[in-house]
């Protein structure tokens, strides 16, 4: 990944999934407070669905203790897929899903790859942001160990 700890997060347009699907600049949502952003290859994929996303749901209380104001999950998917995925977990306010529809954000941080020739995906990563500055960044080397919430929390 070309983004590093200490860098300011680049701005890109994504679709935020709240009450409605709304296009928004990442600077408006990720440049405030202390937040976690984790990226993953795709909604409904086995590791993302069985390990990565659930790890952040299970760690909600620990995240609050670390003064994390919000958790965001981003993937190169369309907003309808991300919305269905979020509803399948009944996320409520625990995790805000972001659809990086064309992969512009993912490309801007150098996290893109083409998985099995099936198209643009995001590498798996987790980062801690404070007012838009990357304070901690972990890129996954395996399936989902380093970037799972429990392991990431040990590093911050």
Regions found by a protein language model. Name each.
Residues 1-156:
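Chalcogenol-based redox active-site neighborhoods
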């Amino acid at each position: 990944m070309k983004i590093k700890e200490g860098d300011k997060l680049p701005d890109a347009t994504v679709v935020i999934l709240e009450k409605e699907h709304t296009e928004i600049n990442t600077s408006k949502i990720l440049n405030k407070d202390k937040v976690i952003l984790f990226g993953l290859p795709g909604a409904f994929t086995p590791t993302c669905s069985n390990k990565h996303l659930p790890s952040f749901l299970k760690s909600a209380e620990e995240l609050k203790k670390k003064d994390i104001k919000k958790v965001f999950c981003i993937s190169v998917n369309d907003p309808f897929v991300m919305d269905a995925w979020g509803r399948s977990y009944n996320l409520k306010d625990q995790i805000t899903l972001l659809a990086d529809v064309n992969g512009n954000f993912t490309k801007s941080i150098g996290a893109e790859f083409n998985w099995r020739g099936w198209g643009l995906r995001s590498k798996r990563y987790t980062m801690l942001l404070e007012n838009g500055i990357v304070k901690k960044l972990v890129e996954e080397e395996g399936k989902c160990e380093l970037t799972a919430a429990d392991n990431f929390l040990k590093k911050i």
